[in-house]
A protein has these predicted regions:
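Terminal amphipathic alpha-helical/low-complexity segments used for targeting or macromolecular assembly
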Residues: 1-41, 104, 111, 117-123, ...
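Short Cys/His-rich Zn2+-coordinating modules
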Residues: 44
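Beta-rich strand-turn-strand
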Residues: 148-161, 167-171
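Flexible, glycine/small-residue-enriched loop-and-beta-strand segment within the central core
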Residues: 48-58, 64-153, 182, 190-191
């Protein structure tokens, strides 16, 4: 019976994701408020998708751009108040781990955060058969992540940090620091 109910819910959410305009945004916002772990004032734009929404907590006012993708199937996601992400953001804790985003965080378009990575150390076995490893991601308060950035598992980004567009962040970022590049390196400290 649960399979049928889940299938019906998937159909409803797919249809809702394509409903245009302000009415569509209102309907999606009301629908997902019921589905999330912690309902809050979240504006959901078209084509957004939420996998395992009961493990996704929005703690305050939030604005999500079109095609936002949040997956907590196996992990969890917690997002602080006054959060904004632009179009096509991919926030993924699907294999395990937790993504914690503090308050007053801005995320540009096409940003990817993923708590998991493929195992690949055993050269006698295909990579796609070696499973995954995972770790948490933590984003501090008042952080700006520019467009097309990738935040890898195990990373902590400190309060007031700025991640330059296109950066791949594979290690921690200190408070009030600008980083950029592949892999991301410190550009300067903010005062």
């Amino acid at each position: 019976m649960n399979i049928i109910i889940n299938e019906i819910i998937d159909w409803i959410e797919t249809l809702l994701s394509y409903t245009p305009g302000k009415v569509g945004t209102l309907i999606r916002t009301l629908w997902f408020r019921y589905r999330w772990k912690n309902p809050a004032s979240v504006r959901v734009r078209p084509l957004s998708q939420f996998i395992n929404p009961k493990q996704i907590a929005f703690l305050g006012k939030t604005s999500l751009g079109k095609q936002a993708f949040f997956s907590a199937d196996g992990g969890s996601i917690e997002i602080g108040e006054n959060f904004s992400c632009n179009v096509n953001c991919h926030i993924n804790a699907s294999v395990g781990g937790k993504i914690t985003i503090s308050k007053n965080v801005l995320i540009g378009p096409n940003v990817v955060m993923r708590t998991a990575n493929h195992n690949f150390d055993d050269r006698d076995q295909l990579i796609n058969q070696q499973g995954h490893n995972f770790n948490n991601i933590e984003i501090g308060e008042d952080v700006w992540i520019g467009s097309n950035c990738v935040i890898l598992s195990g990373v902590k980004i400190g309060k007031g940090a700025v991640i330059a567009a296109g950066a791949v962040v594979n290690k921690d970022v200190a408070n009030n620091t600008i980083v950029g590049g592949v892999p991301a390196k410190e550009i300067k400290k903010l005062k």
